[in-house]
């Protein structure tokens, strides 16, 4: 399973660790992904999404029905 948020599309980024002496070593910044089940009232079933915490806030704001409709319009299987 890839580390990509299904709602926002957030992916891992790359950057540097910086020591006290300012030495740079490459590292990855991973999105805060959660596996979460949401109840779709219109379909009387749960959907499982792998979403970031930012994606959860978007679902809280817009509603799960709207977000799932947007995912399906993008061609994502939900």
Swiss-Prot record:
Keywords: Ribonucleoprotein, Ribosomal protein. Residues 1-21 are annotated as: Disordered. Pfam families: Ribosomal_L28 (PF00830). GO terms for cellular component: cytosolic large ribosomal subunit. GO terms for biological process: translation. GO terms for molecular function: structural constituent of ribosome. InterPro entries: Ribosomal_bL28 (IPR026569), Ribosomal_bL28/bL31-like_sf (IPR034704), Ribosomal_bL28_bact-type (IPR001383), Ribosomal_bL28_sf (IPR037147). Gene3D superfamilies: Ribosomal protein L28/L24 (2.30.170.40). Belongs to the bacterial ribosomal protein bL28 family. This is Large ribosomal subunit protein bL28. The lineage of its organism: Bacteria, Pseudomonadati, Pseudomonadota, Gammaproteobacteria, Alteromonadales. The gene is rpmB.
């Amino acid at each position: 399973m890839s580390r990509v948020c299904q709602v926002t599309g957030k992916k891992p980024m790359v950057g540097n660790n910086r020591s006290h002496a300012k030495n740079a070593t490459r590292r990855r910044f991973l999105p805060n992904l959660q596996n979460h089940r949401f109840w779709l009232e219109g379909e009387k079933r749960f959907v499982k999404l792998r979403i970031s915490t930012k994606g959860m806030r978007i679902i809280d704001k817009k509603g799960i029905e709207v977000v799932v409709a947007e995912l399906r319009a993008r061609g994502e299987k939900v």
